[in-house]
């Protein structure tokens, strides 16, 4: 139910993004998504200290070295790769700080299988996650999504409704307000079809080397676009 409500509420906002994307394809000389440039993060606090563990996904904050594991009542997580990013990107009046990126292998507890079942039929799987801070530096309410799309070097592309954390980072952000939390996407998932077993096995042997995040456009309280989306590429 939480996933359905999240999708319903944010679908209205991203309708504008979809419309803009279609227009961009039709008019090659028009507006384009631009690459974001990192800003200084020296004055920012460590928001991970105040983070409340997710109710669906195993807490990974103690996983700082490859090979480390952590288990709780939601499952067992193994850290496969990590990148401390700590860079801030400007999207108009919105500051998006990417704190870190991790590749995690997760074996969910049996009680959590149904939650992940709509995204994968695998009993255990890898996912890529980022911890972000998002801040509205203006005095007026805006609407924005830190990750509207994510793609990997494997050729996989995920939109915002494939996020496994659902920490309400998308949508309205009051003037001067900040949000912090995780966004994560299951990668290299099996197709669930017997005839695709060979292709699934090949996917499992390949490595995630980078991801590219595309934010949403930024909209004002009347859903008028005020800033273009940004693209952010992060390498492990």
Model-derived segments and their meaning:
Residues 12-19:
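C-terminal motif of bacterial Sec signal peptides marking the signal peptidase cleavage site
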Residues 5-6, 19-89:
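N-terminal, intrinsically disordered, polar/charged segments of Gram-positive cell-envelope systems
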């Amino acid at each position: 139910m939480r996933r359905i409500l999240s999708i319903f509420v944010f679908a209205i906002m991203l309708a504008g993004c979809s419309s803009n994307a279609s227009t961009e394809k039709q008019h090659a000389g028009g507006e384009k998504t631009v690459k974001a440039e990192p800003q200084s993060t020296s004055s920012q606090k460590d928001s991970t200290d105040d983070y409340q563990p997710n109710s669906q996904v195993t807490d990974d904050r103690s996983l700082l070295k490859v090979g480390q594991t952590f288990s709780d009542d939601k499952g067992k997580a193994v850290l496969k790769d990590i990148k401390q990013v700590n860079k801030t990107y400007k999207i108009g009046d919105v500051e998006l700080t990417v704190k870190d990126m991790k590749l995690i292998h997760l074996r969910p507890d049996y009680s959590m299988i149904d939650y992940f079942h709509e995204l994968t039929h695998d009993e255990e799987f890898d996912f890529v996650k980022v911890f972000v801070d998002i801040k509205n530096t203006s005095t007026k309410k805006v609407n924005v999504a830190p990750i509207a799309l994510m793609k990997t070097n494997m050729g996989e592309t995920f939109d915002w409704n494939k996020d496994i954390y659902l920490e309400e980072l998308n949508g309205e952000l009051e003037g001067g307000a900040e949000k912090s939390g995780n966004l994560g996407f299951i990668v290299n998932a099996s197709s669930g079809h017997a005839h695709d077993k060979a292709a699934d096995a090949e996917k499992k042997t390949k490595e995630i080397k980078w991801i590219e995040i595309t934010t949403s456009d930024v909209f004002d309280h009347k859903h008028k676009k005020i800033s273009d989306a940004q693209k952010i590429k992060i390498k492990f």
